[in-house]
Amino acid sequence: MAKFEAHLKCSFCGKSQEQVRKLIAGPGVYICDECIDLCNEILDEELIDNQTKTREANNPSNKNHTAITSTSKPAPTLATIPKPIDIKDFLDKQVVGQEVAKKILSVAVYNHYKRLAWQGDGNQETDLTATRLHKSNILLIGPTGSGKTLLAQTLAELLDVPFAVADATTLTEAGYVGEDVENILLRLLQKADMDIELAQRGIIYIDEIDKIARKSENPSITRDVSGEGVQQALLKMLEGTVANVPPQGGRKHPYHDCIQIDTSQILFICGGAFVGLEDIVQKRLGKNSIGFMPTDSRGQNHLNRDLDNNQMINNLEPDDLIRYGLIPEFIGRMPVTAVLEPLNSEALEAILKEPRDAVIKQFRTLMSMDNVKLEFDEGAVTAIAQEAFRRKTGARALRGIVEELMVDLMYKLPSEKNVSDFTVTKKMVDEMIIGGKVLKLPSNEKIDHPESA
């Protein structure tokens, strides 16, 4: 037996067991430690080659970095940044009301991009004694449908910068099922056509930020992976850091290269309804409970409660947000707070008619493609606005109501050749609201349009 063992050798290189450190036996074969090391080197080389090919195929930011940066839009200069008054004038064309919020946003956005222009001139790099300008992110507080997302979107349109919207309710702390916070940056990068420099000057709007408030005022012994954990994960990104973003989204992988994005120049705007925040404010102020007021069939008296609640929110202090569930560090990184007012029926009427992309203007354009002139009389506009106000979902309700109203009309009109114009009246809107009836073409097809009620 000893004689047999003396002749054992590696089945691959032929070296005997005396010539190597280790000889591992298998079913009828042997392999030495030197051959194992050689196999590992071959596998590592193939793995690196495959990673390089995959990265070049799937990561355009690395493959075309030189081409992308050479065609990137120039950084803003003080001469090209619109002034706060001009910014507000542009917002007025798209957003009805919210005068105070628009003024706050105009100043905050102007200062942010003025800071970028100042840094782009090299002031902060050449003069070590120069004052450092820090970023001021924005927190928007307002009921649903009051225009929070539209304000942020309109600002990005004016400034011609990439704009991405993220939903805070989908985010979770790293290591748990859900989206990592870095995926927010990937959306912005995709909006910028993978242009890193352009993305770093963009705007990110994080909606439903109130939904990541921690569940209780006191820290819990259990993990709050979609509440306080997400707030902690967002801190560095909001303040300004170099984040590693997986180019394909999802979780980070140790074998995948990440794109590095500097968030110090990205403007973050967070928005939420913060339902119940007014109760926290009124408790601090020692006010009597507002309570729900009696309403008529149209829900008109709800407006008084909304206005009182809005007055409460205007007395907001950071401590109220902490009691609501935001951590102090998170609030400190959102120094600019703008409160949006609830929309009354008059504001909803204006939203129906006045903005560039008003709902009525959109439907007129759609009908004009079928050579039909569509009109809404004043009574119809008022009735639609009052119904939207009753539904308590803000401006979002307007389009849904008009869609319900027009569905049958828009189904038949494209096939009608002898209808040149159509007027929507208050009677038609009331019939739809009360009886669920939709607009129909006149029974006499020779009539161009129905008489106003």
From Swiss-Prot:
One of its GO terms (cellular component) is HslUV protease complex. Signal peptide: none annotated. Residues 1-51 form the ClpX-type ZB domain. Keywords: ATP-binding, Chaperone, Metal-binding, Nucleotide-binding, Zinc. InterPro entries: AAA+_ATPase, ATP-dep_Clp_protease_ClpX, ATPase_AAA_core, Clp_ATPase_C, Clp_protease_ATP-bd_su_ClpX, ClpX_bact, P-loop_NTPase, Znf_CppX_C4. Residues 57-74 have a biased composition (Polar residues). GO terms for biological process: cell division; proteolysis involved in protein catabolic process. ATP binds at P143, T144, G145, S146, G147, K148, T149, L150. Zn(2+) binds at C10, C13, C32, C35. SUPFAM superfamilies: Glucocorticoid receptor-like (DNA-binding domain), P-loop containing nucleoside triphosphate hydrolases. It comes from the Bacteria. One of its GO terms (molecular function) is ATP binding. Residues 53-77 are annotated as: Disordered. SMART domains: AAA (SM00382), ClpB_D2-small (SM01086), zf-C4_ClpX (SM00994). ATP-dependent specificity component of the Clp protease. It directs the protease to specific substrates. Can perform chaperone functions in the absence of ClpP. Belongs to the ClpX chaperone family. Component of the ClpX-ClpP complex. Forms a hexameric ring that, in the presence of ATP, binds to fourteen ClpP subunits assembled into a disk-like structure with a central cavity, resembling the structure of eukaryotic proteasomes. This is ATP-dependent Clp protease ATP-binding subunit ClpX. The gene is clpX.
